Amino acid sequence: MRWVAKAAVQRGLGVLPQGERLNYVFQRHVLRSLPASESVFRRKFSRAQQHLRAYEEHGPGTPPSASVFYEFGAGWDLAIPLSYAALGVGRQVLVDIRPSVRAELVNDSLAAFARLRDELESEAGRELRRLGGPVGSADELEERFGITYLAPRDARATGLPSESIDFVSSTDTCEHIPAGDLAEIFAECFRLLRPEGGFSCRIDLQDHYSYFDPSLSRYNFLRYSDRAWRLVNSPLHHQNRLRSPDYLRLVREAGFELVAEVPSGPSLEGLAELEGLPLAPRFRVYPPEELGVTILSFVARRP
């Protein structure tokens, strides 16, 4: 039941005025999940490359160096936006519901780029832009990397000009946003994109507490009714439990044209896990092959 203890701590922090800051301290000094390990950093760089390939294949045709990328929920260490900068993206706009960027974690990312430069260039098959040394604060992001960081800023209503963005990307963020808010965020992304602009998204549909507590099934959270889940679901680590058809429906309802969807899972082991779980009624209506998707990647385009 380790996950229950973690959920209780994060739910408690979520109601405190300085909950985000305290959660950062909890993640860094108690769980020691921050800063990201080199293996996690490498994965983030690879995901930035995947998004960039989606832009080059399905985007409006503007070279990355002359384009404007947009991301909601940019997080603490900016590993993916910095990867874009290293890969040659000209301008980026990032929004967070609360100020989340931590200069010390951004500097960990910058140090990783310097340390792993040869390896990353080999993986990318191109020379990377040199990002330089540490930053003193988020105020330096725009001048040094072309990154405009806006926080606090509501991703449902950013106030940014319509049709001002070439490409939207999101990595392991959508699963943490309530469904109603996500529908509004997708609609806002549609408004921001220029015609033929692209939207590349990766979503982790697994119970994230299973990463912390190996005794849990990756589908554990599907056992609980909405009422029961609300008791443990923290605003600092919200999990909406949407399944792959739900996300794809929201994308279409926002007006996007889906051009690629790549679900991962369920494996045979995953199907066996699902069969052994007492599913909440809400989840019994999904076919197992849809309910058990663990990772959903999709690319959409504004017509």
Report each predicted region and the residues it spans:
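Conserved class I S-adenosyl-L-methionine
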Residues: 64-76, 198-225
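A C-terminal cap/extension of S-adenosyl-L-methionine-dependent methyltransferases
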Residues: 249-252, 258-303
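Acceptor-substrate binding/catalytic loop of class I
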Residues: 230-245
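A short glycine-rich, Lys/Arg-flanked "PGG" loop and its adjoining helix->strand segment in the class I
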Residues: 183-198
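A short beta-strand submotif of the Rossmann-like class I SAM-dependent methyltransferase core
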Residues: 170-173
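S-adenosyl-L-methionine
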Residues: 110-154
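A short acidic, Gly/Pro-enriched loop at the edge of an enzyme's catalytic core
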Residues: 155-168
